[in-house]
Structure formats: structure tokens, C-alpha cells
Amino acid sequence: MTTPPPRPAAPTTDPGDTPTWAMILGRLTTGQSLLPGQTAWAMDQIMTGVATPAQIAAFAVSMKMKRPTSAEVTELAEIMLKHALPVPTDTIGTHTVDIVGTGGDGANTVNLSTMASIVVAAAGVPVVKHGNRAASSLSGGADTLEALGLRIDLGPDDVARCVAEVGIGFAFAPQFHPSYRHAGAVRREIGVPTVFNLLGPLTNPAKPRAGLIGCAWGDLAEVMAGVFATRGSSALVVHGDDGLDELTTTTTSTIWRVQAGTVERLTFDPAAFGFARAHVSELTGGDAEANAASAREVLGGATGPVRDAVLLNAAGAMVAHAGLSSDAKWVPAWESGLARAKEAIDSGAAEQLLARWVRFTQEL
């Protein structure tokens, strides 16, 4: 039997060495994780415009192929936040919640997280939603909110005012992460998922303590959960077993429950809470105008598969928020979240909150 040739070694590095791109890429392309501080150095080079497009592309792809660790992604996210415009939290605090996904599932569903965010806020839980325009679908959360009449270009102080006055604010990613433009251009040119796809849900400039976070890649959801655990957040990182970056109603979902610095992996079946199985085609969306129309219908009380999925994700966000309390119980938290989500829609509160939010942003 022929012995395969040895794998080429990365350049020898000492933890005290000043990083270089040859050192970083040498480790990644030979399947080795980076040493503490090396990922942060690379991301800082990217965010400050020092890294070349070739270096950025090589880093993003090789990190994804190697499979990033939670420690590496934590460094990426923290450097990105260091360069971000922060949402002031002196009036809104950090006990807010975000509902956001990585995108990239290829299903082109309606904007479930956007609708769920409005429902959660109408139920009395403060929301700071972080989002962007569509990258791979026909309509991202920002596109749909804009079609609903919302001003999406608000700065940090005005987003905080929205949360304080209305109960919900939208942080449009390009507005808060101007330094990310160097990576963003390369990411669009590459056209395939990279480690950068994980960063949107991890870099909300308001730093909410709770989140319902969707991940389109099951093998990377646990990595994201590890980042939230390091931060001491309460989060549900979810991956639909049909591939959606949402809590799905077509089958079961896998949930990584993050609470008090620990991560627990669970299988979640919405049928246990009375939800009928849907087909993914019943959740398919369209362009921004079509998705805005769907949002108006659901928030106006229309029943059906889209409402079910919105209720499920809204409840999940409230479960994550409840997890900020050490005595939160799993099943009772779900029962409470679902009841509050239904009441928020059926009472008209969600529809009214959307109208108030749109009006408030237009008057700023």
C-alpha cells in the first residue's frame, strides 16, 4: 500500500510573531485553525482597507473550507463591531432582541423574520432588527421594510429613538458598518457562501442580549452558538431541517439553545404545539412589493401557513428573550410566546405598531 505524501506544513509561527498574510493563509490552507489574535489582525486589515481584494477573497474562502471555530468567528465579529457605528443604549438598554438569519438558504421565502420582529415588538418585547437588502433572494428585510413605507437609512440616535418610542428599530447594515464595504464588494464578486455570511447576525450595532438567529448551514450553526455563549447572550440559533434559516413549519428544526454561557442542542417539532405541516412552496415570497403585501395580510389577521411560520418565529424570539431570566422554563416559555404572538396580531396591535413605526421614521 502506497503511503500518501505528507500534507504540506504551514509556515512555523510563534504566538508572539507579528501576523502576516502568508502566515494566516498558510495555516488556513493546510486546515489549521488560527492562533489567538490572528483572526482579529486579519479582520482589522480588511476593515481598514489595508488588505487587497485577493487577500480578502483567499481569507474568506479558505476560512470557510477549513471550517471556522467559534473563537475565530468571535474575533471576526468583535473587530467588525469595533469599526461599527454603535446604537446608543443608554435609553433602551441591552435587554433587546434581534430576529435575523444568515440568508443563503436558496428558498426565497417571504420575510418571516421581519414580520416576526413586528409581532414581537407589538407583544411588548423591545426589538432592534439588524438587516440588509437582498443578497441571494428577491427581497431582503430592508427591501420589504422600505416597500412598507419605512425609512431604512436612520443613524444610531434615530434607531435608538425608534426603539424607545415605538418599541422597534431597524439598523440598516451598510449605514452602521461602513468599513465592511471592502469585504462586501469581494463577497459579492465571489458569489459563494464564505465565513462572512455568518457575520450579519453577530454584529448588530445595538448589541442586543437576546436573539433568534437563523443559520442556513447546520454545520456552522453550532459555531455561531458558541459566539453567543462567549458573550453571555440568550439566543436560539436555529436551522430548519428542510434547510431554511428560520424555524420551519415544514418539518422539524434543530435548535442550539444558548443560555448562561452554555449551548444545548435540541430537536424542535412545531407539531408539538399544534402547528400543521406546511410545504415550503406555501412560504415562498416574491419581490419587495409582494413580500410587503404578504406582511400586511398577516399583520392584518390573515390565517394560513405564513401566519403559522411568523407566530412560530415570533414565539422563538420571545423564548430567547425570556432566557435572560435564569428561571425561564422551556415549554412554558414557548406556550407564553405563542399566546402573546397570537394576541399581538389578533388584537390589531401588530398592524398598529407597523403604522406607528412607519410614521415615526418618516417624521424624523
Curated annotation (Swiss-Prot):
EC number assigned by the record: 2.4.2.18
Pfam families attached to this UniProt entry: Glycos_trans_3N, Glycos_transf_3
Metabolic or biological pathway: Amino-acid biosynthesis; L-tryptophan biosynthesis; L-tryptophan from chorismate: step 2/5
Residues annotated as binding Mg(2+) 2: D245, E246
Positions with a binding annotation for anthranilate 2: R187
UniProt keyword Magnesium, yes or no: yes
Disulfide bonds: none
Reaction catalysis annotation: N-(5-phospho-beta-D-ribosyl)anthranilate + diphosphate = 5-phospho-alpha-D-ribose 1-diphosphate + anthranilate
GO MF term set: anthranilate phosphoribosyltransferase activity; magnesium ion binding
Annotated 5-phospho-alpha-D-ribose 1-diphosphate binding sites: 101, 104-105, 109, 111-114, 129-137, 141
InterPro entries: Anthranilate_Pribosyl_Tfrase (IPR005940), Glycosyl_Trfase_fam3 (IPR000312), Glycosyl_Trfase_fam3_N_dom (IPR017459), Glycosyl_Trfase_fam3_N_dom_sf (IPR036320), Nuc_phospho_transferase (IPR035902)
Binding site for anthranilate 1: G101, N132
Any GO BP annotation: L-tryptophan biosynthetic process
Any Gene Ontology CC annotation: cytosol
Root EC class: transferase
Subunit structure: Homodimer.
Database matches in PANTHER family: ANTHRANILATE PHOSPHORIBOSYLTRANSFERASE
Primary role: Catalyzes the transfer of the phosphoribosyl group of 5-phosphorylribose-1-pyrophosphate (PRPP) to anthranilate to yield N-(5'-phosphoribosyl)-anthranilate (PRA).
Database matches in NCBIfam families: trpD (TIGR01245)
Protein name listed in UniProt: Anthranilate phosphoribosyltransferase
Gene field: trpD
